[in-house]
């Protein structure tokens, strides 16, 4: 029974990630838009990366808090690293190992959050 449940949960994860996959055309346009905003593609895996700089730690932490709340709502969590006023963010969809619509949507939110700090 446990093995069957594990199989079902894996199937659901794969199914949910499949609904968020980008078509080649969507991916190309998303990458162009994200690069225009300062994001870069990682060469070692299908992910995007950007470093943000703020005036001080409080601004950086406030930004991270806003992003964390949105990420939790989306059930889609960034990889990030923070030192003082810098926040480095990498986005990818771990369940399918590629860039998805969720990454693009979260990156767009991140841009708005950074601009409003």
From Swiss-Prot:
Going by the UniProt record, its keywords in alphabetical order are: Acetylation, Lyase, Tetrahydrobiopterin biosynthesis
Q: What is its EC number?
A: 4.2.1.96
- Residue numbers bearing the N6-acetyllysine modification: 101, 105, 112
InterPro entries reported for this sequence: PCD_sf, Pterin_deHydtase
Source domain of life is Eukaryota
Which EC class is the enzyme in? lyase
Name the chemical reaction catalysed here: (4aS,6R)-4a-hydroxy-L-erythro-5,6,7,8-tetrahydrobiopterin = (6R)-L-erythro-6,7-dihydrobiopterin + H2O
What terms describe the molecular function in GO for this protein? 4-alpha-hydroxytetrahydrobiopterin dehydratase activity
Has UniProt tagged this entry with the keyword Glycoprotein?
Answer: no
Q: How does it assemble?
A: Homotetramer. Interacts with DYRK1B.
- Function statement: Involved in tetrahydrobiopterin biosynthesis. Seems to both prevent the formation of 7-pterins and accelerate the formation of quinonoid-BH2. Regulates the dimerization of homeodomain protein HNF-1-alpha and enhances its transcriptional activity.
Q: What is this protein called?
A: Pterin-4-alpha-carbinolamine dehydratase 2
The record lists the organism as: Pongo abelii
Highest lineage ranks of the organism?
Eukaryota, Metazoa, Chordata, Craniata, Vertebrata
